[in-house]
Curated annotation (Swiss-Prot):
The N-terminus is involved in transcriptional activation while the C-terminus is involved in transcriptional repression. It comes from Mus musculus (Mouse). Acetyl-CoA binds at S644, C645, I646, M647, I648, Q653, R654, K655, G656, Y657, G658, R659, S683. Residues 799-841, 876-890, 904-917, 1204-1229, 1317-1334, 1352-1361, 1393-1414 have a biased composition (Basic and acidic residues). Autoacetylated. Autoacetylation at Lys-603 is required for proper function. The modification Phosphoserine is found at S419, S472, S786, S941, S954, S1090, S1091, S1115. This is Histone acetyltransferase KAT6A. The lineage of its organism: Eukaryota, Metazoa, Chordata, Craniata, Vertebrata. Its main location: nucleus. Residues 1511-1636 are annotated as: Interaction with RUNX1-2. Residues 1-144 are annotated as: Required for activation of RUNX1-1.
Length: 2003
């Protein structure tokens, strides 16, 4: 028949039902909907529809119970498989079978005198034809089951008698039935008053029946009836109303009767005690608590119950023994218990039991069975009694045994056997309810928990009582008592109960565990039949629980376990720790939780253990590994909690194990490279334990750290404790003080010395030895090695590593003096080594794919590790060693890593730890066997491989970028040597800086994934790796590092290592302490986590900052020179970092990714404390002007970008030269170069954005480079070559940084600590944002006007300033408080504030280019937060936010595309941030520049100019362009928002945790965005990072991004506005221009000239033209700036913009954005300001709202609007349509929608955006891939041209390619990737491909690996970069799609994503993970890698993904 429901959906629903049932939950509609939507992205309405249809089809079974509907699989209904024969044994599959008759026939047929066995009965019945026909072959198993049930029921009803295994008919049943009742009471001895009853007064009786209100004259039946009156209250009732039998009435009248209200227990005589547990005797109606009964009862007895006082004494031991035997039997086979004892007695006692009085509403607990059942009941009861099975206490009892015995047995049976209730047939059970409502009430309760409530006295006092009572009555003899006690003991022993049940009703009250018998502290939810037992027996190895010792003994014979079912990850002496995965060993973990609950009062987790890892501590002996305790932690914890639950068994308490576990949890956190914190809130005990631990750890850390200055970040890094906990502990220790506007850590030497003295006196019995840990963060994806190293360093190698690292550093040339930095460096190096080798190793496709997939699957696990400590260490090692031995690393992946380890070891013993850690992590697959033999290689290697996969991906990506890349190997090595030295120095710096950040704050839990990613990115170590580390970690790391770096940088180059730490300690400490409470923690957190991220981001930003600061100080002497040097350093850092990943990519990206607004000055300059903020902007503006003079003099914002043609050429040259030179430099002086490169990259990119245009930036960047003079030549060369490259690299680094920062911010949100940071960030950022915006507005205005004049001066100043602030947190600080920047202290303070925010932003802007991703993300996160607040202030933008949220979603993907652009935008933002004025004016141009400016002039133009010629195709292309190049700024904005929201998804979602969590949609957007938006976010962050970054991170990022997206995807309006700019810009890259307009759906960016006219547009023009990313920024700026003219500038500026607005609700948001723009910052400045502000303004309000508002409806609306126009041309529409949800999301700016994105989102510029930075950083090829990405992302991300954008992406990519000359080859590849011709609308096919891929994973498209492939090196770099960038969005998408993360992501992000994008996120997720996993590794170099980009992103952004 035709099915009504879609069979696929039905299958999904059945899967969901199975999944829900597996979770031990009821398959309700809600749960089914959630499960289906999380797995398949199907919306709720559809699921419910299909569910109903499936029910109608009969394919799903609907079960209603108590008004609740459940759904079951009819083929696998679970318990309802067979309609349970509830009616008197009559149950059978065929209703025709009457089991009673069948059984009778069987017994009669068999005629066995002794009885028949079950088997013989079954055989006999099966031989009967009618039976075999009815229950034929298929029903055989069912037949056996039904037969057993029927027999059991018959025994229960008394129709059969059971003697052992034999059953026989009960012939007396019928006759007995009748007699039973009478016998029961009449045969009982007469009642007499008990001693305590005799002298009690009797109340005056009330002569009215309380029930019927009749008198003794007439009852209900109008018959006269004597009343029974209560002796206490006088209330009376007719016996008939009380349902008393005549016998009972007689007996009651002779006694002192109490009514139900007055009833007291006759044993304990406590009236108030649990009345529910009271039983009423059916003989005397006295009450007894179940615990007070002679044998205490746990369950209400079923039949007639006679108290111990009335029970007849039966003489004869035989009977008792028989009963005891029966009891034993019953226990062995509890099933045999008669179900209704009650009923059996029922009839019998029907009269008597009528006693069940339905009195005043409270039924007598006495059970009356329904008459219908009474016959069988009584019969049953009788039989049971006879049988002893039921130990009836009724009629038969007198015959067979004395009442006491009977009671005892009865009690025992009740006590020990499963309650009859449960087993009773339903029909039979029916009565109970009535029979003893009360009894049952108590019963049920008591059965589980109450039974022993008063037991103790119950047993003892009762026994005495009873003895006394019985004795007094002389009913019982001594012999009886002996018998009783004897039997009781026997019975209790059987059950293992040795004492009376305990009064607290703990169930169970005792457990036997191993050789211990442990009294429990609390009840645990064991199944009822177990929990009601007084004692449970647990297997101490598998933790199974059993009812008796016998069963336990039998189990022990069979149980082969002798240790927990997991990998042993730690062993020292006789102590081991096992890592048990709740998803793998579910039963074990559930049993462990049940056991733990016995000793924990607040534990709530028992059955849902899948998301947790359990670290089980064991003490080992010959027998096995005995459980001592455990702690659990979430695999993917948003808050970075490292302990969820912790428990030590009582017998091991007070022996140091608790501290051991806490210490161990922090060791793991450190290995993950993130600070950890126990899950809040803590229990009182937990608080005590943790406070003691924190105190001791901090005091010991302070004791060992004698630095003058120590910051909380450093403490956090050293200890792994999150900054918030450190702060609270320091506060507790009274070691925090507020002095001169800063918090200072006071060393209380006496306290420290006292503690150490105590410690020496009482050594710890058990201590964690990090050397013994063999573990790679499998699940939590953290920077494993780094933190581990830190910890190990903390643990003792600290000093050695420091010394050795110092050695290294000295060797390195930077010669950092801070061992911590060295340690960090080593960490970084190790990570780098680890990662680099891993990258190399992973280069093998098999490994790659393996790792890629595992990484995908284990994003949290593997990826973070990469990012985690391991990753970081490796990275550092790699940076050091990698820089040194880049070649070696590349060539000898693992061996290199190991060698590097060796190097590290040489450098420091920590290196040994690192080596082990690195080995474990880097070589985890290898070392697995060695280092972690206990951990199954599979898992270890999986994580490591995943980690490596990410590394590999990034390395492959990085390979292009880094010498390690294919092409660059030689260069790399040359550079590697240089990088090695420089790397060491930078590594030192990097590590130093990160170290201090790491030190200060423990590894950031926030985005360990990022870190890991970063390490993976280590090939372009400084650029991308760091970016990525920065991306996730940088937010915090950069914040913290920036803080740390700020001071150190301020100190001097030579002091760089230490000063950084020192300032960090001192100033940062103070700052940190301030920030600590809010921002600082996260920062510190970031610090720690970011070691590498920081290294990357901060190394680029901070390190450069350090170098900058040193250089800045030197730079103060030589402003520009030091600054540029820092840029060089940045670049070197970048190269170091980027060496692995960003190096190549960064150069490419640099060109393309130089945001216009961003000065290309090194971050050092930016960071220069002496610089004035205004100067920064002016410089940038001037530079921009100079640069843009060519294209748009008015738009000085473009300073960063050279004339497109120039830039293209330069980019090409510089890219390649820079790539090589960079690599050389990177390798030669990886540290310095990487730093310089990163600095240069970011600064250069920033400075270059102005400088690029005028070449002044290059000169300037080169100027600073002299400081790194050996690099300077390179830098100069690089500057010319690298300028584009640097622009890209810087952009990329900026992106990374922004991403890092955003991610860190995200991390912050994720972490509570981070959240604090974020809050502070948000607060501060908003403060600073406004300041910045104001600055920007003014400067922006000035900037545009002053651009030409001031740009140079400003650029110098700005470069310095920018370098200073930007490099550290000064960037943000710079803008917000230039003064702060100028003043080291103030700067740091400001940085602290700004650090988070502005560091994010400024880092994004300036150093972001190198680590633009992280930075931008961070910046965006911060900015988003800041601007979110702004947005909140500006309600106008809330709608925009929603739109943006949608756009963000779009742009998540766009983000991937736009990532590079994002860099540019970041650069722009950085510029903005760097110099408020400069930033603003420069922003549009910068933003444009972002995409095209340095690295991608042509591309920029191309990007920007995509729209005019593209037509519909053009639109997508242009959108793509915009998305990519043009969108660089918008894209960046997009990305920024998305990064924040999406790229930040990790960060954003977490950073935006407040927002994201507030808005599922936001998270969605974050998730989706993250999917593609992570990059976008990062990119966006760089663009949006300005102001968008902060709030964009969450909202603003979204807004900006969305604006960009809107402008790009949804609202061409931005692009329209931008279009003029685009056209202008397009002028350089013609293709781009053509492609771009349609993309933008804005008029082509001809308005470049209008820049001044349209403030928003001029910048947009510049942005659009120079950098397609500006479209969004343009849009935003246009909207923001134009909004001043037309508030809805996006809408008004071009109709197209408005249509996009209409298309996407986002545009409305953008309207708000224009409002933000209204905060007009004149000219470009206004644009940027608005841009920044928009993020803030939008950020706050809109982020949450956009997410929420945008959700599916809006997104779909947007998508549809946009999708239709553009998708159609390519059949994107279909593709989009197919991914309707995705598309919808895409449309709305659902960059998050990976599926959508690949198709529609692609046009958005996510990938595109990414490409610019990537391209800029890497090569044009890189850019091309990025553009490809953009294409993909653009298609996906940009709603209005989304579909077209698929086409456009090609163009965009091509544009990007155009922008960077080398890109063309990549372009070809890209286009090939997309199946398009490189230049023109090759993208057309691309969109389709994208469309196809979209379903797959836009990541592929997003990460145009083909471009990477094309230019192996460049592409790789780009891939790495792109991957990296893409990875962030993709990572989030990966995060969602990540197999491992898929679940988690799906948990809330995905669902949110779903909410936001329909099922896009889901589609994307599944698709992305696979494509990611496969593609990513499959084509590290190609778009497969791009798809893998998601994975690479995962790998690179693994941490994000993890997030």
């Amino acid at each position: 028949m035709v099915k009504l429901a879609n069979p696929l959906y039905t299958e999904w629903i059945l899967e969901a039902i199975k999944k829900v049932k597996k979770q031990k939950q009821r398959p309700s509609e809600e749960r089914i909907c959630n499960a289906v939507s999380s797995s398949h992205g199907l919306d709720r309405r559809t699921v419910l529809e299909q569910l109903e249809l499936s029910v109608k089809d009969g394919t799903i079974l609907k079960v209603s119970n108590k008004g609740l509907n459940s759904y079951k699989d009819p083929d696998n209904p679970g318990r309802i498989a067979l309609p349970k024969p509830r009616n008197h044994g009559k149950l059978d599959t065929k209703q025709s079978v009457d089991w009673n008759k069948l059984l009778k026939r069987a017994f009669e047929g068999l005629a066995e005198t002794g009885g028949s066995t079950l088997k013989s009965i079954e055989r006999f019945l099966k031989s009967q034809k009618d039976v075999s026909a009815a229950c034929g072959g298929s029903a055989a198993p069912g037949f056996h089951q039904q037969l057993r049930l029927a027999i059991k029921r018959a025994v229960g009803h008394g129709r059969l008698l059971k003697d052992g295994p034999l059953y026989r008919l009960n012939t007396k049943a019928a006759s007995a039935e009748g007699k039973e009742g009478c016998e029961s009471l009449s045969c009982l001895p007469p009642v007499s008053l008990l001693p305590h009853e005799k002298d009690k007064p009797v109340a005056e009786p009330i002569p009215i029946c309380s029930f019927c209100l009749g008198t003794k004259e007439q009852n209900r039946e109008k018959q006269p009836e004597e009343l029974v009156s209560c002796a206490d209250c006088g209330n009376s009732g007719h016996p008939s109303c009380l349902k008393f039998s005549p016998e009972l009435t007689v007996r009651v009248k002779a006694l002192r009767w109490q009514c139900i209200e007055c009833k007291t227990c006759s044993s304990c005589r406590d009236q108030g005690k649990n009345a529910d547990n009271m039983l009423f005797c059916d003989s005397c109606d006295r009450g007894f608590h179940m615990e007070c009964c002679d044998p205490p009862l746990t369950r209400m007895p079923k039949g007639m119950w006679i108290c111990q006082i009335c029970r007849p004494r039966k003489k004869g031991r035989k009977l008792l023994q028989k009963k005891a035997a029966q009891i034993k039997r019953r226990y062995a086979n509890p099933i045999g218990r008669p179900k209704n004892r009650l009923k059996k007695q029922n009839t019998v006692s029907k009269g008597p039991f009528s006693k069940v009085r339905t009195g005043p509403g409270r039924g007598r607990k006495r059970k009356i069975t329904v008459s219908s059942q009474s016959a069988s009941s009584s019969e049953e009861g009788y039989l049971e009694r006879i049988d002893g099975l039921d130990f009836c206490r009724d009629s038969n009892a007198p015959l067979k045994f004395n009442k006491k015995t009977k009671g005892l047995i009865d009690g025992l049976t009740k006590f020990f056997t499963p309650s009859p209730d449960g087993r009773k047939a339903r029909g039979e059970v029916v009565d109970y309810s009535e029979q003893y409502r009360i009894r049952k009430k108590g019963n049920r309760k008591s059965s589980t928990s109450d039974w022993p409530t008063d037991n103790q006295d119950g047993w003892e006092s009762k026994q005495e009582n009873e003895e006394r009572l019985f004795g007094s009555q002389e009913i019982m003899t001594e012999r009886d008592m002996e018998l009783f006690r004897d039997i009781q003991e026997q019975a209790l022993q059987k059950v293992g109960v040795t004492g009376p049940p305990d009064p607290q009703v703990r169930c169970p009250s005792v457990i036997e565990f191993g050789k211990y018998e442990i009294h429990t502290w609390y009840s645990s939810p064991y199944p009822q039949e177990y929990s009601r037992l007084p004692k449970l027996y647990l297997c101490e190895f598998c933790l199974k629980y059993m009812k008796s010792r016998t069963i336990l003994q039998q189990h022990m014979k069979k149980c082969g376990w002798f240790h927990p079912p997991a990998n042993e990850i730690y062993r020292k002496n006789n102590i081991s720790v096992f890592e048990v995965d709740g998803n793998v060993s579910t039963i074990y973990c559930q049993n462990l939780c049940l056991l733990a609950k016995l000793f924990l009062d607040h534990k709530t987790l028992y059955y849902d253990v899948e998301p947790f890892l359990f670290y089980v501590l064991t003490q080992n002996d010959v027998k096995g590994c005995h459980l001592v305790g455990y702690f659990s932690k979430e695999k993917h914890c948003q808050q970075k909690y490292n302990v969820s639950c912790i428990m030590i068994l009582p017998q091991y308490q007070r022996k140091g194990y608790g501290r051991f576990l806490i210490d161990f949890s922090y060791l793991l956190s450190k290995r993950e490279g993130q600070a950890g914190s126990p899950e809040k809130p803590l229990s009182d005990l937990g608080r005590l334990s943790y406070m003691a631990y924190w105190k001791s750890v901090i005091l010991e850390c302070l004791y060992h750290q004698n630095d003058k200055q120590i910051s909380i970040k450093k403490l956090s890094k050293l200890t792994g404790v999150c900054p918030q906990d450190i702060t609270s502990t320091l506060h507790h220790l009274r070691m925090l003080d507020f002095r001169s506007d800063q918090f200072v850590i006071i060393r209380r030497e006496k306290l420290i010395q006292d503690h150490m003295a105590k410690l020496q006196l009482n050594l710890r019995p058990v201590d964690v030895d990090p050397e013994c840990l063999r573990w790679t963060p499998v699940i939590v994806s953290n920077s494993v090695v780094s933190e581990d190293e830190d910890e190990e360093a903390d643990e003792g190698e600290k000093e050695e590593p420091q010394g050795q690292e110092r050695e290294l550093e000295t060797r390195v040339k930077v010669g950092k003096s801070v061992s911590r930095e060295k340690k960090d460096q080593e960490s970084s190096s190790l990570i780098e080594t680890d990662k680099k080798p891993e990258v190399k190793e992973l280069a093998s496709s098999s490994r790659l794919s393996k790792q890629a997939l595992p990484r995908d699957s284990l994003p949290a696990n593997s990826q973070p590790p990469r990012r985690g400590r391991c990753g970081r260490k490796n990275r550092k090692t790699q940076e050091r060693f990698g820089d040194k031995d880049s070649k070696m690393l590349v060539d000898e992946t693992l061996s290199a890593s190991q060698e590097q380890y060796g190097d590290c070891e040489e450098k420091s013993e920590t290196s040994q730890e690192r080596f082990t850690e690195m080995e474990e992590q880097l070589a985890a697959p290898q070392v697995q066997a060695d280092g972690k033999p206990d951990i199954p290689k599979g898992r270890f290697s999986e994580s490591v491989e995943l980690w490596r996969g990410q590394l590999k991906k990034s390395p492959e990506t990085l390979k292009c970028r880094l010498p390690e890349g294919n092409d660059r190997l030689p260069c790399c090595y040359t550079d590697g040597d240089r990088a090695f030295f420089r790397g060491f120095s930078e590594s030192s710096e990097e590590e130093e800086e990160p170290e201090s950040p790491r030190s200060n704050s423990p590894p950031i839990l926030t985005k360990p994934t990022l870190k890991r990613k970063k390490p993976i990115l280590h090939r372009r170590r400084r650029v991308r790796k760091r970016k990525h580390h920065n991306s996730s970690v940088v937010t915090e790391t950069i914040s913290e590092t920036t803080e740390v770096l700020d001071e150190p940088f301020e100190d001097s180059d030579s002091e760089r290592p230490m000063p950084r730490l020192e300032p960090t300690f001192e100033m940062e400490e103070e700052e940190e302490e301030e920030e600590e409470e809010s921002e600082l923690f996260p920062r510190g957190y970031f610090h720690c986590l970011s070691s590498q991220d920081i290294l990357r981001c901060q190394s680029s930003s901070k390190r450069p900052s350090k170098e900058e600061e040193e250089e800045e100080e030197e730079s103060d002497d030589a402003d520009d020179t030091p600054v540029l040097k820092p840029v060089s350093l940045l670049r070197k850092c970048d190269v170091n970092s980027a060496s692995l990943e960003p190096d190549t990519s960064t150069p490419m990206k640099k060109k393309k990714g130089w945001p216009k607004g961003k000065s290309r000055k090194p971050i050092h300059w930016k960071k220069r404390p002496g610089r004035k903020p205004g100067f920064k902007l002016n410089q940038e503006i001037i530079a921009a002007s100079a640069q843009e003079c060519i294209v748009e003099p008015v738009v000085p914002i473009k300073p960063g970008r050279k004339p497109r043609t120039q830039e293209n050429e330069e980019i090409v040259e510089v890219k390649e030269d820079l790539l090589e030179e960079r690599k050389e430099e990177m390798h030669t002086e990886p540290d310095e170069e990487a730093e310089e490169e990163e600095d240069t990259t970011s600064s250069d990119i920033r400075a270059m954005s102005p400088l690029d245009s005028s070449n002044s930036p290059e000169a300037e960047p080169k100027e600073p480079e002299p400081e790194e003079e050996d690099e300077k030549p390179s830098d100069d060369q690089r500057q010319s070559e690298e300028e584009p490259q640097e622009l890209e690299e810087q952009e990329q680094e900026e992106e990374d940084e922004v991403t890092t920062e955003a991610n860190q911010n995200e991390d912050h949100d994720a972490d509570d600590e981070d959240e604090g940071h974020l809050d502070s960030l948000k607060t501060k950022e908003p403060e600073e944002q406004p300041a910045r915006e104001d600055d920007k507005e003014e400067p922006g205005i000035q900037g545009s006007f002053l651009a030409a004049n001031m740009q140079d001066s400003r650029e110098n100043t700005k470069d310095k300033d920018e370098a200073e602030p930007d490099s550290e947190e000064d960037q943000p600080s710079h803008e917000a408080s230039v003064v702060s920047e100028t003043m080291p202290g103030s700067e740091e303070d400001h940085e602290e504030d700004s650090n988070t925010k502005e560091e994010l932003i400024e880092l994004k802007e300036e150093e972001e280019i190198p680590h633009s991703e992280l930075d931008l993300e961070t910046v965006q996160a911060v900015q988003s937060l800041t601007q979110e607040e702004s947005s909140e202030h500006e309600g106008a933008y809330q709608d925009c936010e929603e739109t943006l949220a949608a756009c963000q979603t779009l742009q998540s993907y766009t983000h991937t595309d736009e990532d590079p652009q994002m860099s540019m935008v970041e650069d722009c933002h950085a510029s903005e941030h760097n110099s408020p004025i400069s930033s603003i004016p420069s922003h549009p141009s910068q933003s444009v520049r972002s995409v095209n400016s340095p690295s991608m002039p042509a591309l920029e133009s191309g990007y920007t100019q995509i729209s005019p010629e593209q037509g519909s195709l053009s639109a997508p292309s242009m959108q793509n362009m915009e998305t990519s190049p043009m969108m660089d700024v918008p894209s960046v904005s997009d990305h920024s928002q998305q990064v924040v929201d999406s790229g930040f998804s990790d960060l954003g979602s977490i950073e935006s945790t407040t927002e994201n969590y507030e808005n599922p949609s936001s998270y969605d957007s974050t998730m989706g965005s993250s999917i593609c938006g992570n990059n976008s976010s990062q990119s966006s962050c760089s663009y949006g990072g300005l102001s968008s970054s902060s709030s964009l991170t969450q909202n603003s990022c979204v807004v900006t991004q969305q604006m960009a997206n809107m402008g790009n995807s949804c609202s061409m309006l931005q692009q329209n506005t931008v279009q003029p700019a685009a056209n202008c810009n397009i002028k350089s890259p013609q293709t781009c221009v053509v492609e771009r307009p349609p993309s933008n759906q804005q008029p082509p960016p001809p308005p470049p000239p209008p820049p001044p006219p349209q403030q928003p547009q001029p910048p947009p023009q510049q942005q659009a033209a120079p950098q397609p990313p500006p479209p969004q920024p343009q849009q935003q700026q246009q909207q923001q700036q134009q909004p001043p003219p037309p508030q809805q500038q996006p809408q008004p500026p071009p109709p197209q913009q408005q249509p996009p607005l209409s298309q996407c609700s986002m545009n409305n948001s953008f309207t708000a954005a224009p409002m933000i723009m209204e905060i007009p910052e004149s000219g470009s400045t206004g644009n940027i300001s608005i841009y920044e502000r928009i993020p803030g303004d939008f950020g706050a309000g809109s982020y949450s709202q956009p997410s929420a508002t945008f959700s599916l409806a809006k997104l779909q609306q947007l998508t549809n609007t946009i999708m239709d126009p553009h998708a159609m041309p390519y059949s994107h529409s279909p593709a989009v349509t197919s991914y309707a949800t995705s598309v919808s999301l895409s449309n709305t700016g659902l960059a998050q929608l990976a599926p959508s994105h690949p198709l529609a989102g692609t046009p958005q510029a996510q990938a595109t955006m990414t490409p610019p930075p990537n391209l800029a950083s890497t090569t044009m090829n890189l850019t091309s891939p990025l553009l490809q990405c953009n294409m993909s992302a653009t298609n996906i991300g940009i709603p209005h041209t989304q579909r077209l954008q698929g086409q456009m992406p090609v163009k965009g990519h091509i544009s990007i390619r155009s922008k960077s000359a080398p890109l063309p080859s990549a372009t070809a590849h890209q286009q090939q990737l997309y199946g398009r011709s490189p230049p023109a609308v090759a993208m057309q096919a691309g969109p389709r491909a994208l469309a196809v891929q979209r379903g797959m994973n836009m990541g592929v498209n997003l990460m145009p690996t083909p471009a990477y492939n094309v230019n192996s090196m460049n592409m790789n770099t780009l891939n790495a970069m792109n991957s990296y960038r893409m990875t962030q969005p993709m990572m989030n998408s990966s995060y969602h799609s990540n197999p491992a993360y898929m679940n988690q992501t799906a948990q809330y992000p995905m669902q949110m994503q779903m909410g936001m994008m329909g099922s896009q996120a889901y589609t994307q997720q599944p698709m992305q993970p696979n494509p990611h996993g496969n593609m990513m590794y499959t084509g590290p170099s190609h778009h497969s890698y791009m798809n893998a980009a998601g994975v690479p992103k995962q790998s690179l952004n693994g941490p994000y993904m993890r997030r």
